[in-house]
Design a protein with these regions (language model features):
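Conserved HGGG/HGGXW glycine-rich cap/lid loop of the alpha/beta-hydrolase fold
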Residues: 26-79
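Flexible "cap/lid" loop of the alpha/beta hydrolase fold
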Residues: 132-167
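Short beta-strand/loop motif that positions the catalytic acidic residue
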Residues: 235, 241-243
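Catalytic active-site module of serine/aspartate enzymes centered on a nucleophile-bearing elbow/loop
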Residues: 265-297
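Short glycine-enriched nucleophile-adjacent loop
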Residues: 117-128, 133
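Conserved alpha/beta-hydrolase catalytic His-Asp/Glu region
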Residues: 168-234
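Acidic catalytic loop of the alpha/beta-hydrolase fold
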Residues: 246-250
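Active-site loop/oxyanion-hole signature of alpha/beta-hydrolase fold enzymes
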Residues: 23, 31, 69-115, 126, ...
Length: 297
């Protein structure tokens, strides 16, 4: 029996509209939350092998904002790009094209979560207009070593093996229940048994929502390209980093180093949580985001 979604009641009170737009050959599906006339509009770039659902626990706690959450190309309901590679440069080009296609009257606040933090930071550093930048669980340490060299090599071999298999076998490997469960168990830090169960169920629901094995393998290679600090000096907008005290994917010492690389940035550390801030501490994440937005001139 499934665990009820903790934020379902809050989310049900927010108007949600689904749209579709083509960007770099990707039929990109996106969801628009909240009032169209909100003071702030946020565009979200989600994490690796996730989709727009992932940040909904936080979105549900910010009903006053207009939030636009696309599925990145090749994940969720969005098809892969045909006019760009599925690397950080390709995804940053897609993000810039997506925001341009929205036709917003003013540049939005851009929020990057985990993998999306690299995409968003790189896009803004290379000239994409934005009002501000918010990074949740940002990749602030070299991703090849952040989680441990051994684990990274093993994971890289896993995705590399999927490339050489026929599609049905590759999908069977990538979507194996034990593989997804192991990944989920390594990320969860909460002691709340009900919340832990719900998070595992969420990963099983959405972690396998990718278009094809090659795109998901390309995405993993993209996730190893660079930490956000490489592009940080080129970000000329106010920036908020929201990090987990116990994040093993991108440890806290890297966050303290990285925040100093941005021209105008602050760091909020949420205690007793790891790489799943959006699932485990959505109230704290929403508070940090809203306080940051309130201080924007």
């Amino acid at each position: 029996m499934s665990v009820p979604t903790p934020h379902a009641a809050l989310l049900s009170e927010i108007p949600i509209r689904e749209h579709e737009v083509e960007v770099l050959g990707s039929s990109t599906h996106y969801w628009e939350y909240g009032p169209k006339d909100a003071e702030h509009t946020i565009v979200i770039a989600h994490g690796y092998r996730g989709d727009h659902h992932g940040f909904e626990p936080v979105i549900a706690r910010m009903p006053q904002l207009r939030i636009i959450g696309p599925d990145l190309p090749g994940f969720g309901s969005s098809t892969p790009m045909t006019e760009a590679s599925h690397n950080i440069d390709g995804y940053r080009r897609w993000l810039a094209g997506f925001i341009e296609a929205l036709g917003l009257p003013t540049p939005p606040v851009v929020l990057g979560h985990s993998f999306g933090s690299m995409v968003a930071t790189r896009a803004i550093a290379e000239g994409m207009p934005a009002r501000a930048l918010i990074l949740v669980n940002p990749i602030a340490t070299d991703p090849k070593i952040g989680a441990g060299v051994g684990i990274t090599r093993l994971t890289r071999a896993f995705y590399g093996a999927s490339r050489g298999l026929p599609r049905p076998l590759a999908n069977a490997l990538l979507r194996n229940w034990l593989v997804v469960q192991f990944m989920s168990m390594t990320l969860v830090t909460t002691d709340d048994p009900t919340l832990r169960t719900w998070i595992h169920e969420e990963h099983h629901r959405f972690f396998n929502g990718y278009s094809d094995p090659r795109t998901v393998a390309d995405g993993f290679e993209a996730s190893l390209e660079a930490e956000v600090g490489k592009a940080a000096p080129g970000v000329g907008v106010p920036t908020l980093l929201v990090a987990g005290e116990n994040d093993t994917i991108t440890p806290l010492d890297g966050q303290f180093r990285t925040v100093e690389l941005f021209p105008d940035a602050r760091l909020v550390v949420i205690p007793k949580v790891g790489h799943l801030i959006h699932y485990e501490t959505p109230d704290a994440a929403a508070t940090a985001i809203l306080e940051f937005l309130d201080e924007l001139a």
